[in-house]
């Protein structure tokens, strides 16, 4: 009985740990996209409109087991250089399509927005998620503000 109780407590915590680990892997992967955007901004004085202009592969080719795609979007505004990092799966309630075990993050999109530097400052990145999951602890603390991911 004690083993059953311990298992009932430990299993959900372990599953949450696994999801957070997958999110961290996705955050590490997006660093290469950030670097390409920063280089483009340094050379052209503005943010790229899309992956091609940034010298990156197509969004679906920037992927991993835990990332469906990474798309550069300007939203028609060259002052905006957002990266949209889409997680695989389906976010529709009741849908069982979560092939990578991302839980509430399946099918959601995390956005990374650069802060335009003043003079020679380094570029800072804001992170946000618009389709906020019910399990917000799965999202890194720095990404829990949905407004920081939009222009």
Label every model-predicted segment.
Residues 28, 32, 36, 49, ...:
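Charge-rich, low-complexity amphipathic helices
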Residues 1-34:
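N-terminal single-pass transmembrane signal-anchor helix
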Residues 42-151:
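Periplasmic/extracellular, small/polar-rich flexible segments of pilin-like filament-forming proteins
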């Amino acid at each position: 009985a004690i083993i059953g109780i311990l298992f009932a407590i430990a299993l959900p915590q372990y599953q949450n740990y696994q999801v957070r680990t997958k999110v961290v892997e996705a955050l590490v992967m997006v660093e290469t996209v950030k670097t390409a955007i920063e280089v483009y901004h340094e050379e052209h004085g503005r943010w790229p409109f899309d992956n091609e202009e940034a010298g990156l592969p197509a969004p679906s080719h920037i992927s991993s087991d835990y990332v469906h795609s990474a798309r550069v979007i300007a939203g028609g505004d060259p002052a905006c250089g957002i990266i949209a990092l889409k997680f695989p799966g389906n976010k529709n309630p009741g849908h069982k399509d979560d092939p990578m075990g991302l839980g509430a993050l399946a099918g959601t999109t995390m956005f990374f927005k650069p802060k335009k530097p003043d003079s020679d400052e380094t570029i800072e990145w804001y992170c946000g998620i618009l389709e906020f999951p019910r399990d917000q602890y799965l999202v890194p603390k720095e990404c829990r503000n949905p407004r920081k991911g939009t222009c």
